[in-house]
Structures are given as C-alpha cells and as structure tokens.
Regions:
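Bacterial N-terminal signal peptides that target proteins for export
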Residues: 1-13
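Bacterial N-terminal signal peptides
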Residues: 10-22
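Low-complexity, acidic/polar, glycine-enriched regions of mature
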Residues: 24-199
C-alpha cells in the first residue's frame, strides 16, 4: 500500500492558489475583437417580398468584461463602411455612394456602449451610441455572452465567442434613398470572436 502524506502547509498553499485563481478570473478583462473571425451582418427587405443579406468585412474594437459583474461590460467597436459586401458589385458600389453610407465622407460605423443590464444567464442588454452616416443614435444590443473562454490551439492566449442582435431604422441616420423599394428597418447580427493574452 502506498501512503501519500500531505502536510497542513501544502493544504494551505493549495487553498491560497485556488483563491488567487478565482480572484484573477473575477478581475475585469479586456478582450480584442478578432477581425478575421468576426462578422457584422445585416438584412433588409426588398420590395417587401425577399430579403437581401450582406456584411461588412472589417471590424475591430475592444470589450471590457468583469465576470463577477457583467453589468460593468463595456464595448467599443469600429466597422470599415467601405468593406460592405452583398455579393453584387453594382449594389455594393451604390451602398458606398452618397445614396447610402457615403463612405468617402463617413468611412466608419462605430458603437460605444453606455450601459449594460443582465438579461438572464449569459445574456445582456447593452445600450450604446451607434454612429452611421455621421449620425449618432442610441440602440440596444441583445447580447449572448454565454460562451466560455478557451485556450487558443495555436498557443496565442485565450479566445471567447459572443453574438449580438439589434434593428435600426435607416431614416434615423439620414438614409432615405429608394424608400418603398428597400425597407426602412434593417436587422443587424454580430458574430464576434474575442482574444486576450493568457496570464
């Protein structure tokens, strides 16, 4: 029979390490949006009979998250408006033009959160300022942050996923071209992958 002797000091050390690990996990964490694994997607009704879908190909930003108090979550994100892609070149050029996003004058779409509220386990309602076409309006994102962090398989720190949805009225942002052909309400879905260095 093999007996394993454990001293009281070893037990105390293990407890301290566990407590410190928990404390570290509870600290506010800043995550970077990974543009290579993030999609800012939108959909809009065309003639009231079909749905046109597209996305912006380039997004960046940061998310600050406190596991012990998710209501302290803050988000800052920037989208390159010129990267709009609906898979139809003529339509994409029109979306970049003064008819819609006017990307030469307003090259970015930005979001900056102002408040976060719990909406259930792993769920948040994040209120913030959305700026499109040079106009800023308050919107609420329904956020699913139930994903748990994992170790990057390439050894580059930690990764975590999140998603968010909202809808906006393009008229609120001064975009009124082709009313009656393209619906005013736009559905937005964000699928985000976040990264941060491992401690």
């Amino acid at each position: 029979m093999i007996r394993i002797r454990t001293s009281s000091s070893t037990v105390i050390l293990a407890v301290v390490i566990a407590a410190l690990s928990t404390f570290c996990l509870a600290e506010p964490q800043t995550w970077q949006i990974d543009p290579n694994h993030t999609a800012a997607q939108f959909s809009v009704k065309h003639l009231g009979i079909s749905t046109v879908r597209g996305q912006f190909e380039k997004a960046s930003g940061t998310v600050s998250f406190d596991p012990s108090d998710p209501t302290k979550t803050s988000i800052e994100a920037t989208i390159d408006a010129s990267t709009v892609n609906t898979r139809v070149q003529m339509r994409d050029n029109d979306l970049r033009s003064p008819h819609f996003f006017e990307v030469e004058k307003y090259p970015t779409i930005t979001f900056k959160s102002t408040r976060a509220e719990s909406a259930g386990t792993g769920k948040l309602k994040v209120t913030g300022d959305l700026t499109i076409h040079g106009v800023t309006k308050q919107v609420v994102l329904d956020v699913d942050a139930s994903s748990q962090p994992i170790n990057d398989p390439m050894g580059k720190g930690l990764r975590m996923g999140a998603s968010a949805t909202t809808s906006v009225d393009c008229r609120d942002f001064g975009i009124t071209y082709m009313q009656g052909i393209v619906a005013d309400e736009i559905q937005i879905t964000l699928d985000v992958e976040l990264t941060r260095p491992a401690k």
